Amino acid sequence: MKRSALAGMLLALVLVAACGRGQATARTTVRFWGLGREGEVVRELVPEFEKRHPEIHVEVQQIPFTAAHEKLLTAYVGDATPDAAQLGNTWVPEFVSLRALEPLDARIARSAVVRGDSFPGVWDTNVIDGKTWGLPWYVDTRLLFYRTDLVAATGAHWPPRSWGEWREAMVRIKQRGGRGRFAILLPIDEYEQPVIFGLQNGAGLLAGGGRHGAFRDPRFRQAMAFYLDLYTSGLAPGLDRQSIANLYQQFAEGYFAMVITGPWNLGEFRNRLPPEMQDRWATAPLPPPEEGMPYPGASLAGGSSLVLFRRARASEAAWQWLQYLAEPAQQARFYQLSGDLPARPSAWRLAGLAADPRAASFLVQLEHVAPTPKVPEWERIATRVAECAEQVMRGGRDLDAALAALDADVDRILEKRRWLLDRSAEETERRP
């Protein structure tokens, strides 16, 4: 009898242990790919999520930014995409065109994610063909970093409310600085500046639903002319990124008084400028083309979004993870870990950013940002824009000829897109 009771107890213990092991192995694993440093620090947010959701385990794979695009495409071709990932905003259209992503509208409608608690232009980067394909995770945009002492010495109206006021301030800075000194640094091989000026001036960049280039549009031509005048007038040096020896040292030495750059340089300026320079720099939103236009002028809607892959094996659990990352408290914590600006304005208050005057300029600017054209070919087109500007600046072509050639190049890049769109339209017309 005792042996029978003992055997029964042992059997019960074995069954309990087996059940425990079964419960442990029953956890759902979410495979998440993070890019660059974000892929490292996001791991710090996993323990709290798993504490809330003990049935879910998050497996984070960090991928270097330099290899991320190719790795994501390779994973798509090989049917090996993760459940969810971080995706640069300009990459979203490409993966939508591949049918690699799941639209999120139905999920968002049932969740605590609030579209109103976002920067409209940033949210819009994820909306393609009327559907939402990603949740903004962190944001960036570009505005002015400037030397307060050099600007104040000119007596110019600041911050400028138009391109004209801005140029007048730059002329005064150049006059005071003399030979070998410049008002602004604008690396000639960057596409962002001419595109920003074009968007501010109402240029669409592409026409026909993204079928053709529209860089000969008078609004873009005017923007490009303003941009190139900064070089021909000697207000900006004709340097590309490789020719800039040390941006922070040259800024401190007064080689240039201002630069258009992004939030990553908030930390860099604090860390790399000498102590005596720390009270001599500030940030300001970009001016619009004309006084009386909405202030500030538009800038680019950058950053990264959180996407769910169509072939996700654990889509429900992955959506729980993405919602968690989008919470204001987690975005504020992620800012503390990474320095990336939160995509939800409510998180700025939690992170203390709204009280920082240098960061506050970004808060103002982010309410006035616009996405680049939502076509998979955009990055190739952007490279052509920078090449076009450099050709004109170096005297290789006049502006009108360069813009005509740019439109021709862009039309060639978009040839396959035109064919696909036209074919889709024909098939739609043939349907009964």
Model feature map: region roles:
Residues 129-137, 142, 167-213, 256:
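Extracytoplasmic/periplasmic solute-binding protein
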Residues 169-172, 210-240, 286-289:
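Glycine-centered hinge/linker elements that transmit conformational signals in sensory
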Residues 125, 281-286, 335-387, 391, ...:
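Long, aromatic- and glycine/proline-rich binding clefts that accommodate carbohydrate-like moieties
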Residues 154, 225, 229-237, 246, ...:
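Extracytoplasmic/periplasmic substrate-recognition and gating elements
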Residues 105-118, 183-184, 203-222, 271-276, ...:
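Short, solvent-exposed loop/beta-turn-alpha elements that line the ligand-binding surface or hinge
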Residues 48-118, 152-161, 250, 254-258, ...:
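Extracytoplasmic "Venus flytrap"/periplasmic binding protein-like
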Residues 74, 82-83, 111-150, 182-183, ...:
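A structural signal for short loop-to-beta-strand junctions that line the ligand-binding cleft
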Residues 89-143, 167, 196, 278-286, ...:
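Hinge/lid segment of periplasmic solute-binding proteins
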